[in-house]
Structure formats: C-alpha cells, structure tokens
Amino acid sequence: KKWGWLAWVDPAYEFIKGFGKGAIKEGNKDKWKNI
C-alpha cells in the first residue's frame, strides 16, 4: 500500500506534537531534570 506507512507515522507525529505542547505548558519544572 502506497500510504501504509502513514498509518504509523501520522499518529506518531500527532503524539509528538501533543507531547511538545505539554512540555512547553509545563515550562521549566524540575521533572525534566529526572530524565
């Protein structure tokens, strides 16, 4: 299937975008020091 890869890539991209927005919302909280 030509677009078969989009079945994984598109949701993953949306997840990463959402995670990025969440990280920005959290700002510089100390939890990031624990990574």
Swiss-Prot record:
One of its GO terms (biological process) is defense response to bacterium. The keyword Membrane does not apply. InterPro entries: Bacteriocin_lactococcin-G (IPR021089). Keywords: Antibiotic, Antimicrobial, Bacteriocin. Coiled coil: none annotated. Pfam families: LcnG-beta. Kills Lactococci. Bacteriocin activity requires interaction of alpha and beta peptides in a molar ratio of 7:1 or 8:1 respectively. NCBIfam families: lactGbeta_entB. This is Bacteriocin lactococcin-G subunit beta. It comes from Lactococcus lactis subsp. lactis (Streptococcus lactis).
